Amino acid sequence: MNSINFLSIVGLISFGFIVAVKCDGDEYFIGKYKEKDETLFFASYGLKRDPCQIVLGYKCSNNQTHFVLNFKTNKKSCISAIKLTSYPKINQNSDLTKNLYCQTGGIGTDNCKLVFKKRKRQIAANIEIYGIPAKKCSFKDRYIGADPLHVDSYGLPYQFDQEHGWNVERYNIFKDTRFSTEVFYHKNGLFNTQITYLAEEDSFSEAREITAKDIKKKFSIILPNEEYKRISFLDVYWFQETMRKKPKYPYIHYNGECSNENKTCELVFDTDELMTYALVKVFTNPESDGSRLKEEDLGRG
């Protein structure tokens, strides 16, 4: 699309006409789209004018720094993915993953108060929201994949150090820390933290998912921990409501210790910002004694 046509379309949007913008733009995602997902919503918006044009009854607003859309599906569906494409295209950077978030609702629910932190040059955006039937609202298959032993829920292979044979931190995804002992990852709205380390000889045991109907500000799950199901490593993923660009990370920890003397272990989720979906990948090793920590990580997990 040439610049004249692009400016003409943006002009129509700014005067309240709903026109799909089709040219190169910067893409932002929450969640992961699959071909069988249903389109719940699609619209184009101008990002410079307030009040913005209401589409299908969903309220929206613009200020100097943010665009906000209040979406709630009238179908019996839960949100599986959200895509925002902004125009014109600007060089992307690693910080983009934090510029789109749901203040309330989100993946796994039927609503999202969608907040987009704009840049000055961005003047229009397409928004696409997808969903799946609410009766089950399971995303396990799309985040486990075909090879959960070797590939994480971001689609990245687990990599190991030579000294211990334990997995190493990711360096090609946004990373944050708390108290220098807890590491959090974040991409496309999907958060992650890991409890202890994955060893090359571990086995993938199961994936436990917790959907929105079972999630509170504080909740827990019970995991088996005996014989061949002795827990060696947990890879924990979730979506959460985020009030600001800087999220408040949850506290995820065992209730007490998870030692080889425990037949079960309780994993506790203690949150300030409500989760909307969680997935725990459980890895096991009958030889694990629960001491898989490095000196610099004391206090982690």
UniProtKB/Swiss-Prot annotation:
Glycans are attached at N262. The keyword Signal applies. Keywords: Blood coagulation cascade inhibiting toxin, Complement system impairing toxin, Disulfide bond, Glycoprotein, Hemostasis impairing toxin, Secreted, Signal, Toxin. One of its GO terms (molecular function) is toxin activity. Its main location: secreted. Residues 1-23 form the signal peptide. Transmembrane segments: none annotated. It is found in: Secreted. Expressed in salivary glands. GO terms for cellular component: extracellular region. Sand fly salivary protein with antithrombotic, and anti-complement (alternative pathway) activities. Is a slow, tight, non-competitive, and reversible inhibitor of factor Xa (FXa, F10). Is specific for FXa (Kd=3.86 nM) and does not interact with non-activated FX, or all other enzymes tested. In addition, it blocks prothrombinase and increases both prothrombin time and activated partial thromboplastin time. It also prevents protease-activated receptor 2 (F2RL1, PAR2) activation by FXa. In vivo, it abrogates edema formation triggered by injection of FXa in the paw of mice. Interacts with factor Xa. Associates with complement proconvertase C3b-B complex. This is Lufaxin.
